[in-house]
Amino acid sequence: RQMCIRDRNNSVGKQGLNGWIFALLTLDTMGYKTPEGAEFDRERILDEIVSSQNTDGGFSLSKGESDIDITAMALQAIAPYYNDFSRDDVRKSVGKAVEYLSGKQDSSGTFGSAEADSQVVIALCSLGIDPEADSRFVKSSDLLTAMLSYQNSDGGFSHEKGGDSDELATGQALCALAAQKRFELTMRRIYDMREELSVLQREKLDGINGRLSDISDEESAEKALKLFNDLDCDERTYVRLSLIHI
């Protein structure tokens, strides 16, 4: 399958950074290949996203102050490339963006709205980071608990606490809950719509992911790296290397 990313104005990013973000997410939904010589291939789109990062680690829709939602969305798009050792710029970009988001979370654990919390939950799950347990995102409560505090008695979510339920906040919260569940079950990322990982693939991934926390010296790191290299390329992107520094 091939997909050609283009638009009438020959600029995917005319609307802003989210144009590049959704272009990459679209390509990766089914692992589409871009035609040889395409102007907007994966490398070009990745370059555009990473080069747009602000000095504080965040991203913005266009040039200006970093935005929590856009930063989280950028992470969702580039997360599948974190384990690509040929793209050290992606790994550094992810690290800075995660640090930026951690610093923007308030003392109660929220980012200020149901939508922002939802987008960050999706981003963290895409990176293999647990929103309920990672110390960078646990303040007086964890991020997932903070997001759920926006849910009303009618089942919907509100933009602000105490507000009326609305479709946008509820829809994004549902996506975040789905992302969290898929993370817990070692399933594909929410925007990865290829055939689901098999039971055997999930068992292999759970095995290597469980070893990552035990890496304490060069020998244990080499053993983990061998297990990583033994995986199919399709599986490697789901190894949670973002939890360690290699």
Predicted regions mapped to residue ranges:
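Short, small-residue-biased leader/transition segments that mark boundaries at the very start
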Residues: R1-I5, I246
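Well-ordered alpha-helical scaffold segments within catalytic/enzyme domains
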Residues: Q2, F22-E36, M73-R87, Q119-A133, ...
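Solenoidal tandem-repeat scaffolds enriched in leucines and small polar residues
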Residues: G19, D28-F85
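Short sequence/structural elements of tandem HEAT/ARM alpha-solenoid repeats
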Residues: E39-R44, D88-K96, R136-D142
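Terminal, non-catalytic domain-edge segments
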Residues: L143-A146, K161-L200
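Beta-rich interaction/scaffold domains
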Residues: R194-I244
